[in-house]
Amino acid sequence: MSKIIGIDLGTTNSAVAVLEGGEAKIIPNPEGARTTPSVVGFKNGERQVGEVAKRAAITNPNTISSIKRHMGTNYKETIEGKDYSPQEISAIILQYLKSYAEDYLGETVDKAVITVPAYFNDAQRQATKDAGKIAGLEVERIINEPTAAALAYGMDKTETDQTILVFDLGGGTFDVSILELGDGVFEVHSTAGDNELGGDDFDKKIIDYLVAEFKKDNGIDLSQDKMALQRLKDAAEKAKKDLSGVTSTQISLPFITAGEAGPLHLEVTLTRAKFDELTHDLVERTIAPTRQALKDANLSASDIDQVILVGGSTRIPAVQETIKKELGKEPHKGVNPDEVVAMGAAIQGGVITGDVKDVVLLDVTPLSLGIETMGGVMTTLIERNTTIPTSKSQTFSTAADNQPAVDIHVLQGERPMAKDNKTLGRFQLADIPAAPRGIPQIEVSFDIDKNGIVTVRAKDLGTGKEQNIVIKSSSGLTDEEIEKMVQDAEANAEEDKKNKENAELRNNADQLVFTVDKTLKELEGKVEEEEVKKAEAARDELQEALKGEDFEAIKEKTESLNEIVQNLSVKLYEQAAAEQQAAGGAEGQEAPQNDDVVDAEFEEVNDDDKENK
């Protein structure tokens, strides 16, 4: 069975890992980094992904970041006149991760385990699966990020029973999960979180502070200047990271904008104390989900054996201090918070292929599922934190006499009223025989698979008539749309490959021109003038071709020039060999005389030595 890669598709950074020799290993990207910024840029019809796109963001307005925050919604990014869904942008990132994983492994990769925040709803999970499909990946499993982290942490600790709390504060989402580890079983007891809380929000607090300070000093609102805002964003992210290690950092942005008197510079010293003050409310927002997870698992803080930190934002000292205070124990620092999720996903891939044995993963659904019933109430069929896969059915009836159809409104959430919860989908069971209200028996069944994706079925028990719906992402992508996106992604991948090949061809041609110039100087006067002129003419033709975009012509002229230069070099070596041979023959004729002289001198030296003794 081919390898299944593990992908942590993050809000700000993504990572890919693979199981090798029973161990999960992070695959470095082409720049050598172990994580890749989840940033996509479009420039002159070309796509840039990762660090390259992030660096160019200051000058390139067609740059998209933190797209994960829009997964499962109807959000669209319009770039160069084309609309892109969050799935398509995510697919571009996944394609990039897939391509360098293939380069590393030396084989085609078409299967993956992709992680999502534990608190992602059904629409967001479905959107993630669609993104994988568009990128040319068969998503073998959608796994919760905290669960993946627990897998990576607990793989070598399966002999000991322990209860762990995974505190996952990433770039855009926050999750807390409580799991029990023992005898190779990883059982999730509860999960809670906030899909609108992450490192991006901490950055925004710094940006808002810098904008306010600059406006106070200079009367100019930098938030209206896109380029200045991107520079502020980069500076804020750097300052946040710096303040995890030092108590004060200098934010210096020269020529940030221009005023009436000329260019203006931003110079601000940000202390850790000020940063903690600015972000205090964000840190406080992590407490309620932590308490909720403990409550749902029927545990107290003292029952937790180990606290695992996941996500780059857990490096913030105030966050660590809050966890320590809330749970009464020092968090475990033996795992890399940026890498542990991808590694756990790779381990789950190994479980699927059979490379990892005796490991059972029991995950839960993060939110309750139900339908809308009379009075706009949500009737729950599956409670949150139910172990998945699972199924549940309940019988309902009609609300009016001779009601011909029943509308099924599928909901996900914890609020008592239907309107306050997330709509997953709607469908209708029609052709119900005329009968007084309360007589027809309509059975509604919910099924949740191992990926947390929901199927709902409604059946008229009287007639046996049935209707079902697989809940699709609320972005409303049809199978045809996904298929078209798959084809577009493949075409783009082919185009990207061709662009890369053309760039290499151009570079090789440039290098050849340089080499030819150097070689012709060395050959001056050593080969026939006619041969030199032939090489110069071919070189000039290649230089002319390099001015255009006809890559077939460049390839042809490169091959032609290469052949001429090789022939020149061969002639040069042949000439040199002939000269050496001629010189060697002349030496051979004089050799006997020289031998006599050397022998005579040698004899004399020995005689002298004998006399001296």
Swiss-Prot record:
CDD domains: ASKHA_NBD_HSP70_DnaK-like. NCBIfam families: PRK00290.1, prok_dnaK. Acts as a chaperone. GO terms for molecular function: ATP binding; ATP-dependent protein folding chaperone; unfolded protein binding. Residues 577-591 have a biased composition (Low complexity). Induction: By stress conditions e.g. heat shock. Signal peptide: none annotated. Residues 577-613 are annotated as: Disordered. Residues 596-613 have a biased composition (Acidic residues). Keywords: ATP-binding, Chaperone, Nucleotide-binding, Phosphoprotein, Stress response. SUPFAM superfamilies: Actin-like ATPase domain, Heat shock protein 70kD (HSP70), C-terminal subdomain, Heat shock protein 70kD (HSP70), peptide-binding domain. It comes from the Bacteria. It comes from Listeria monocytogenes serotype 4a (strain HCC23). This is Chaperone protein DnaK. The gene is dnaK. Belongs to the heat shock protein 70 family. The modification Phosphothreonine is found at T173.
